[in-house]
Amino acid sequence: MGLDGLAAYLDAYLENIVREGKSEHTVAAYRRDLQELLALLEEMPSANPSNCTRGDFVQALRRLSGRGLGERTLARKLSSWRQYCVWLVKRGLMHADPTADIKPPKQPERVPKALPQEWLNRMLDLPVDGGDPLAVRDHALFELMYGSGLRVSEIHGLNADDVYLDEAWVHVIGKGRKQRQVPLVGKSVEALKNYLPLRQTASDGKALFTGRNGTRLSQRQIQKRLAQWAAQNGDGRHVSPHMMRHSYAGHLLQASRDIRAVQELLGHSSLSTTQIYTKLDFDHIARLYDEAHPRAKRQDE
């Protein structure tokens, strides 16, 4: 298949992955990667313009590498190209996948950053102004981040009826529209019970976390509120939703030693994604948890 063919089926491919449940961000990333590929192939002289070969894709990857792109970025772009080619082959539109044996750049293993257990407990146990609905909301939001390890996109998408306080669990729609049930620790249940009576009614009638005007908090707003909270009350360290999730995963894995259970709780489709947390080494942890999560303990214990 040549450049014209690759361009002709691009929209159909993107429509297909939308139907498969890929998020808007994922679809947009695929679109950028594939449009960039088409532009690279168009720039390059080819011995056979009607048939893009393995060498053409290798050359495109080298050009991106020459622009200073990192190994992880290059590997992601190659993955986008490969998934498109596989889709074309499965539908009989391409004879063979020209990217099949192209090796992605070797990626350095990177251990996720996590926060010390004692620091998180101290921060989350700070007094909350019960007369300030936004402070109560934020406290519930942060307890949920660490207590259940949700992605910022998952917290953003939560509806009020996704939370079952009596049963202490939350219904989560994760990547690829995959659904899972995640337990709520005692501190999260307590914080949500304090927040729900003060919650600004959602303009869509559904959103769990809303702003003053009732609109659903955006992912960016959630990130900003967390960063501001940490800056105002902490020791100046940067805190992100990813770090809260990594802390949840690492602390829980160290306490439970059950990597399969942690995989399910995090919503990882592959165990290899979860295994990176086995390499976390927290200097600030003096002992393992008495329970699977420290926030599960009630105040009177």
UniProtKB/Swiss-Prot annotation:
The active site is at residues 151, 175, 242, 245, 268, 277. Residues 110-290 form the Tyr recombinase domain. Site-specific tyrosine recombinase, which acts by catalyzing the cutting and rejoining of the recombining DNA molecules. The XerC-XerD complex is essential to convert dimers of the bacterial chromosome into monomers to permit their segregation at cell division. It also contributes to the segregational stability of plasmids. One of its GO terms (cellular component) is Holliday junction resolvase complex. It is found in: Cytoplasm. GO terms for molecular function: DNA binding; tyrosine-based site-specific recombinase activity. GO terms for biological process: cell division; chromosome segregation; DNA recombination; DNA transposition; resolution of DNA recombination intermediates. The keyword Cell division applies. PROSITE patterns: CB (PS51900), TYR_RECOMBINASE (PS51898). Keywords: Cell cycle, Cell division, Chromosome partition, Cytoplasm, DNA integration, DNA recombination, DNA-binding. It comes from Neisseria meningitidis serogroup B (strain ATCC BAA-335 / MC58). Its main location: cytoplasm. The keyword Protein transport does not apply. This is Tyrosine recombinase XerC. PANTHER family: PHAGE INTEGRASE-RELATED, TYROSINE RECOMBINASE XERC. Forms a cyclic heterotetrameric complex composed of two molecules of XerC and two molecules of XerD. Residues 1-89 form the Core-binding (CB) domain. Pfam families: Phage_int_SAM_1, Phage_integrase. Belongs to the 'phage' integrase family. XerC subfamily. SUPFAM superfamilies: DNA breaking-rejoining enzymes.
